[in-house]
């Protein structure tokens, strides 16, 4: 007879790990976390450490404002990944891939990977770009490549999760095109909430 799973019926654990330069990806991360909480999940929303040189940040007003005023006191850690049943990764596009800041954090996960501690969790990804064809899908796919190596089960946003996604969503994951430095609109935030809710639902089943 199988041993009972001590986590059975417990709330699913979701961690949202992201990099944001101006706050747009952070807004999507918070909406995703909100959607997961709506499904009863325990949620941690964690930015990764900023690694860009000061002179680069100084040259961009919105980047500088975010670095100086962002509200996060706790940054992402390996413990957050091990704790979670479901993981969401978020980053602005950088030439069709994730930002170096997020990649640097992910490059520290080798120990957890070697121990199999990231396998059989559920993963999903989201992004933002400044242009309509600036690499939204390729950035999400690039982040998902990490899940393949971890053995994490990949959960796309899809279109079936909510009717509104047929007109406003990206089936790869929540995304936002920030024209003229605009913040995510209601459609983008709804897509992120739907993604978070779906991640919590699937993670709960996997944790059981």
Predicted regions: what is each one?
Residues 148-173, 178, 182-190, 199:
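A charged, well-structured terminal subsegment
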Residues 119-167:
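Short, glycine-/small-residue-rich phosphate/pyrophosphate-handling segment
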Residues 1-117, 176-208:
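N-terminal beta1-alpha1-beta2 submodule of the flavodoxin-like/Rossmannoid cofactor-binding fold
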Residues 21, 84, 88, 94, ...:
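Short glycine/serine/threonine-biased micro-segments
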